[in-house]
Amino acid sequence: HPYGQGPSGSPGGTISKLTFDASGNVSASHLYAERLSFPTSIAPYKDGVIVAAGDLIFLRDTDGDHIADVRQTLLTGFNQGVTDSNLSGLRWGLDGRLHGVNGGNNGIIYSPQSAADPLALRNADFAWNPLTGRVSRTYHTGGGFGLIFDRFGRSFTPHNINHILQRILPVKAMERFRGFPSIKATSSISDHGGMARIYPISTAQTRVNHPEQAGYFSSSGGMGLIPGTFTHGSLVGGVLVCDVVGNLVHRDVMYPKGPILEARRAPEEQSHEFIASRDLAFRPVGLETGPDGHLYLMDMQRGVIEHPDYIPEQIMGNYRIREGADRGRIYRVASVDETSYENTNLASATHEELVAHLGHENDWVRGTAHRLIVERQATTNRSSFKEAIASGSITSKIHALWCMNGLGMTHIEDVQLGLNDQHPEVRVQSLKILEKHPEWWNQAWPVVQSMAQDPDAEVRFHIALILGCHPHPDNEAALI
């Protein structure tokens, strides 16, 4: 960053593999991969990782020397722009697909291993199915850096001055109606403004080319969730957003607002931030929950974060653009009330053990168990899933339903059980699964029709979407 390596601008991005000792401290760092083009995001997959680095690339170490000796391009054709708007935000979704944000750079993407036609992203984000290799447009892109899913599958993304946008209407719903305006399909949900007030404690509070943004979000990018293991007060369910110019991490608490959510500044932080630093090189760019239940914060450490394209030429000579490139940091953030977890070796867990982890309060454990179940494609046992759907926690029900769908094991009776669940979040996800099975539509119609009067606004919103997908003579009456 920002122009590549050396005078020629050759790819100089790297990935390091860290190993930890028994106390949870880093004991070694290995150069896992190098010569990558602006790597922005990484996701685990099978016995390797998938990285967003200009292309979507699979990396794998086959001989145990901590160096990736397999490098396979899964998707290519993404347009490149200013680095914070490149392909980023890789996240595994409940649907078993790898989701990413496009950053508004468009592109015509395709898989070198597939005969499928190239896909014009236009102004949309995307998802890749590892089982079929198929890539799809998902939501109108927010145009920013980063993506998160909450535990119920809702997705959020930032874009510079708009620090939190919810992806509301999927592309497939909008494309049924030619000319349907898409501008609000991914929309700001902040109750404290599109360019919200922030409270940095550092002296540099503005971008060189935007002095009017001092004291307000100007460079939001990189998001995370408060881990489910953090149970103190309003920490529960919180969303974190980084602002690299402000040297801070902001926290919002989510509240229902009709069929979507509203992000409100945390009550304990009305005039200060969740994390703020006086270090002008503190550049938070991402947050992740670890296997131990702690929150991990990535600090890019740069003296100058503004891209040179936006710095006036007459003052460019005053800046050392690469200062801090050798000082990246990772912080571990723990809650004083947090339960301490031993790292669970899910790689050796049985199918039944993985299903039991689908209701785990640690987001990492829950999501990893889900991913491994779908990766293994073991379709021999439905009983553990059915038990989770019938009597598990909200998250175990949701994950069990989607795991069965990812394994091709879902029966209409499973979905009907979810449609009648007492929790609206389970009903919403059951509707999304039903939408993927038009062969069940006529049989499920009576239940769906009755749900048009559901007391929950988010459920009613998804009823309207699904009625638009599946024609039926009584659809209009149900909507009215």
Regions found by a protein language model. Give the residues of each.
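Beta-propeller domains with acidic blade repeats across secreted/periplasmic ectodomains
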Residues: 1-353, 364, 372-375
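Ligand-binding pocket scaffold of soluble enzyme catalytic domains
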Residues: 65, 436-437
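Amphipathic alpha-helical scaffolding segments comprising HEAT/armadillo-like alpha-solenoid repeats
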Residues: 347-355, 378-390, 408-420, 439-452, ...
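Hydrophobic core positions within HEAT/HEAT-like alpha-solenoid repeats
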Residues: 355, 370, 386, 398-401, ...
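Conserved, compact domain cores that house catalytic/ligand-binding motifs in diverse enzymes
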Residues: 359-382
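Short inter-helical turns and helix N-cap capping residues of alpha-solenoid HEAT/ARM repeat scaffolds
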Residues: 361-362, 392-393, 422-423, 455-456
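Residue-level detector of extended alpha-helical repeat arrays and alpha-solenoid scaffolds
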Residues: 365-366, 397, 427, 460, ...
